[in-house]
Curated annotation (Swiss-Prot):
InterPro entries: AAA+_ATPase, P-loop_NTPase, Signal_recog_part_SRP54_M_sf, Signal_recog_particl_SRP54_hlx, Signal_recog_particle_SRP54_M, SRP, SRP54, SRP54_GTPase_dom
GO molecular function, one term: ATP hydrolysis activity
Function recorded in the entry: Involved in targeting and insertion of nascent membrane proteins into the cytoplasmic membrane. Binds to the hydrophobic signal sequence of the ribosome-nascent chain (RNC) as it emerges from the ribosomes. The SRP-RNC complex is then targeted to the cytoplasmic membrane where it interacts with the SRP receptor FtsY.
Pfam families: SRP54 (PF00448), SRP54_N (PF02881), SRP_SPB (PF02978)
The record's note on its domains: Composed of three domains: the N-terminal N domain, which is responsible for interactions with the ribosome, the central G domain, which binds GTP, and the C-terminal M domain, which binds the RNA and the signal sequence of the RNC.
UniProt-listed PANTHER family: SIGNAL RECOGNITION PARTICLE 54K PROTEIN SRP54, SIGNAL RECOGNITION PARTICLE SUBUNIT SRP54
Gene Ontology cellular-component annotations: signal recognition particle
Name of the coding gene: ffh
Enzyme Commission numbers on file: 3.6.5.4
Protein name listed in UniProt: Signal recognition particle protein
GO biological process, one term: SRP-dependent cotranslational protein targeting to membrane
Amino acid sequence: MLELLTEKFSHALEKLTNARKITEKNINQTLREIRLALLEADVDYQVAKDFIKRIREKVVGKEVPKNLSPAEFVIKTVYEELVDILGGEKADLKKGTVLFVGLQGTGKTTTIGKIANLLKKGGHKVAVSSTDLRRPAAMLQLQRLAERVGVPYYEFEEGLGAVEIARRAVKRAKEESVDYLLLDTAGRLHVDEELMKELQEIKEVTNPSEILYVADAMQGQTALETAKTFHERLGLTGVVITKMDGDARGGLALSVKEVLGVPIKFIGVGEKIEDIEPFYPDRIAQRILGLGDIQSLVEKAQEVITEDKAQVMATKVMTGEFDLEDLREMLRMIQQMGPLDKLLSMIPGVAPQLKHLKVDEKQFKKIEAIINSMTPEERRNPKIINMSRKKRIARGSGTTVSDVNKLLKRYEEMKKMMRKLQKAGGMPAIPKMPKMPRFPSEASSFNLFLFLST
């Protein structure tokens, strides 16, 4: 996600690393590259132009704070401006009826299922319904998603029009004291008057708390132009951007708030029901600048591991008692947190510096099979594993002695790295990488990426 933009921003800002002061020459070169990066990312032309203008006004001729280098001052300014054009603060979803509008093929119906799942996990009472009479398959799809998530799907007798279905769905949601009614609407391959009139009538009878436009990140400015039409007729309150995980550019995300004046509420980051995230402008800005996203990483960890369990794991790491049973537990935890490449992108400095690493997620199964073939005593004390034991473990796991040796060697290297981390109080210095945070779980995750890389 946003890899291309991150790479180009890093390259542009790198030129200021050794600068003793900000001059017209060096800042012009940096800003020129940033401007080109934005335009290549399909950011709206006026948005890119204004962005560069604001940065120039804030850094050229200004005194650099004593606690910052010239490069840090520029990066700080760029970060603040990125947060601003991305929307400033996270925009919460207002309770009530939420209308989802947009064209066909953007993932609107699937997005409703994902958001229903997210809201339910947050402890909210959620219901869904559909007014998309033109695509019966969409109604069936939403019904199945609702069953999977475990929220009610409001279905009504045949013969009702879209507007009447919407009215009855709202009435039922109020009777059942639902926090959020997520209402799907008909889409089109392109905007037409019939669609807009129907949506306006649905808006009138439902009095929605939110009207969210669902846009495909890959469509860039095309999606933005269509969103303008919807906004003019309906008064959008927010945007959901789907397929962000496949968007290396990010032009749509960087243009929405400035062009439409409404915030991005959610982003879709994968195909699974869990692959939806609230949109945090500051976190996206950090990712664009290669500063990682520790907040999201911690939140993902908290979903799969309790604080007590994390403390036990951290204590084992610090005391050198981390064994192969703990490694197996960590592997399972990391798998539950999501794809390795996504987690890697959240660690500050790691993604751009270690992008040459290839992480094969099939390694998980192989490593776990090897560890499972060991006896409890061998897992707790790998030093007793001699050649005879290695042959038995290899046979039992369907691997080779070489695979077993590789696992044991990397395990010992990982333990050594962890001990160094604890003594140093954080990630040891790696050229051109920022110092890593002092959280054992994050350091362990980083080492696990190295452990699994091929």
